[in-house]
UniProtKB/Swiss-Prot annotation:
Residues 138-212 are annotated as: Recognition domain (REC2). The lineage of its organism: Bacteria, Pseudomonadati, Thermodesulfobacteriota, Desulfuromonadia, Desulfuromonadales. It comes from the Bacteria. Residues 651-664 are annotated as: RuvC-II. Residues 213-270 are annotated as: Recognition domain (REC1-C). Part of a type V-M CRISPR-Cas system. This is CRISPR-associated DNA-binding protein Cas12m.
Amino acid sequence: MKRVTITIDGEQTKGIVIGTIAANHTAAEWLLTASVSAKSAKVRFDPEEAVAETSSLVMIAPTRTEKYLYLVPDEQVQPVTTIVRKYGLLSPLDWDCPDYPAGDAFEHLFLQNKLWNDLVTIEREHRAKYRELIGSDEETAQMDTEIASIKDRLSVLDEGRKKLRVEHRKKKCPEIDCLDENIKKLKSELKAVASKAKETRAAAKDRIRAAGNDIENLEKDRQAAVIKAYNNSGLWWGNYNAVLESYKKARIKALKDGAELKYHRFDGSGRFTNQIQGGMSVQDLLEGNRNVASLRLVSSGELGDISGKKPPSLDLQSVGSRRDSREYGILAITLYTGTDEQSKKFRRTLSFPVILHRPLPEGATLKSLSVHRKRVGTDFVWSVVFTFTTDCPTYDQRSSTGNRCGLNLGWKKQAGGGLRVATIYDGSDARHITLPQAIIDGLDYVNGDLQGRIDSAANENHAWLLEQWGGDELPESLQELRSMLRRSKRPHPAKFAKAVIAWRNYPEYLGDARDEAEQRRKATKRLTIEMAHKREKLLRRRMDFYRNTAKQLTSVYDVICLDKMDLRRLALLEKGDGTPNELTKIARKQRQQAAISELRECLSKAAAKNGTQIEQVSTASSATCSACKGKMEQVDGIMWRCRECRALVDQDINAAANLFREVL
């Protein structure tokens, strides 16, 4: 579905395209299979009349209870473009303002986290009742695991048989015959288990159909529990709506992946969301015409005076650069963080110094804004995300080039430095996308040297503190902490810090040792802060590299073909049958550094923006020769050889070439 603007009775109205009717066809058949939401809308056209040209079904909802369905020729439909702008914020100026209740804004973040956890509890209880209603699906899950295990064993035996055939240069010998017999038995076993699994799934579907009314009532109970949870959350509607949207998206993904929603530990992070009814122009935002949000532009010097921080300085090299074109302002947003004596919503404002590294989009309508608070180490980083809509595209509509490519995702350390994360083949040339070595070195330092120093300090501090607190004269409250430390399976800097802070209440007890404990705590804290900030910076650099790469690819190619690979299986330490995953320790580290799921996500977003088509296919792209379609076998590392034509090729280039041929 996409948002569009149409003209009705001479006035422009925004709506959502929910379907398309081809020329010389009617909408009657489409309406028969339409969703409940579409069927409940009032139809403003004759569904039995054939359209002369391809038209779009547009749903208009002027109120929450009214829905109208229009049939509009495509040439009269004007797409609405969504623009998202993210800017950095300095710390709020009135976070602990005496004019407002103490800790009210912080409490609002806590309530949002609590609402999320309440929704997770509701979802888990709903899943448990659903499983109880339709019967246990453990048998089906066990069979799926058994099928996956048999397939893995078949794959291992088949690979061994191929190697023996190459080694003996014939298809028959005692060793190969033994493998053939084992493969035959496994295939027979797989067929029997698959047949039984099919019967089990059919029986489960019958149980679901039989329990249709009960399942419907169970879903109604879940929805009622969700409504009760957000009504009793104590949150303003804009903020509980943001939590609900996150819950709906996470729930759909969890149901699709067979996963479970997880509770969130509250660490002070969160967001404040203002949804602007009817929208607001950029001019209204700058002039402060609406109390929901305002942005007052100031000079860099004034920003420094207000925030108490030194204003950013510019040198001659910055003149004419993007940094030179920055603007500064004070962003004020309205929050409802509680109720007064008359049980009315209590309104307050939060003000932030903001750095506008890029201009706000002209002529756009502001629909919502979110202020985010994220913990990084012991500090918090603030940012604001504006969501605008406009009828004018914000980027040049590129003409079709007809270019296509196959893109194979993976990771491989390059001899010249860097980590290969993808290989592109477009029919004439093959090239690699390489993550810069500077990012790899930084991640190695953070996750290796720095993390190791923190772990060593935690172990040393743990043993040292237990030695200092070994006497019987230890105060009673500290004895409880000592017991907690002794029970800990793994020393942690936070546990040591908690114990040292509690020690401050007893300055007379081992004063010299207490001073040393403070020094140890501060040293560990410095390392922890350094690690958190360096990791955050490196992850931002990697994301920026992937975004730029995705933008370049989608500006050149009309169609990009990817392998439909399940990245979750690569993250598992064990297979379904309990056997270890094939990835080595080094390969696992490189997988985390590459984070190819982020590259795939960036490609998806850039393709949607630039009009590039992403095709995902399931094919044995690495094991099939791109030249003759013969079977490939590994020779040395990344190099594979075809058994038929004896071509020696890079595995990634061969896979990218096979993907390219899928979209020819």
